[in-house]
Amino acid sequence: MKKELLILISILLSTLTIAGEIPGQAGNDGKRIKGFSGGMMAHTGFLWGGDNPYNYSPNGTTFGIGGIARVSLSEHVRTGFEGYFSSMGLKEGVVSGSHNKLFWTGVLADYFWKIGKCYPYIGTTVGGGMETAFYMFEGNKQDWLPEANVVLHKQPFLAVDPFIGCDFAVAQGLRLTVKADWLLAINSNGLNRPQGPRIYFGFIFAH
């Protein structure tokens, strides 16, 4: 968790630093960077499916947070990086306190438009991540006794994350954003599960 928090803090600090350094590069001045945008997003979603040897199929609501930083290379094309962590608490079929957690980060590219105060976009992030699964099939989490039927499994994966969203300008340099995605987490055995859609809400600083 410390590593994930450090990466997210780095994204936020990069957002604030770059925002303060390139306020005048959004015009047609011949420079490669036409603008910058970045911020933080919280998300929720519903995941289902299992790829474990215990015939257990976790499902439930996931919650998480993360950050994004992008530079505009043209009037419609952006690139940058983002990172998120997401946690799904589990109760059905396991003892309360079991969970499935994901962390992923990567390089993104998207295509965007400007329609009035709206900036719809579509793109993909490619990178990597880690799944942490903790399943307690029997036992009492309130005591200090060892439990026999407990599984802790970590699995790295290749992250391919297609997304679609829209930024809404609410003030000069400030936008609200909404985004939906479906993370494809690919491990050595194929497609990682559980999986499902997520929806993100947050704020974006843009220059």
Residue ranges of model-derived segments:
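Residues that define the transmembrane beta-barrel architecture of outer-membrane proteins
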Residues: 34-36, 59-65, 99-105, 118, ...
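Extracellular loop and loop/strand-boundary signature of outer-membrane beta-barrel proteins
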Residues: 50-55, 91-97, 146-152, 185-191
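Short glycine/proline- and aromatic-enriched beta-strand/turn motifs that initiate or cap beta-hairpins
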Residues: 19-73, 78-79, 204-207
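Gram-negative (and chloroplast) outer-membrane scaffold detector with strong preference
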Residues: 44, 70-144, 160, 168-174, ...
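Sec-dependent N-terminal signal peptides
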Residues: 4-14
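Predominantly the C-terminal beta-signal and adjacent terminal strand-loop region
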Residues: 22, 88, 160-207
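Extended hydrophobic secondary-structure segments that form protein cores and membrane-embedded regions
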Residues: 38-40, 122-125, 178-181, 200
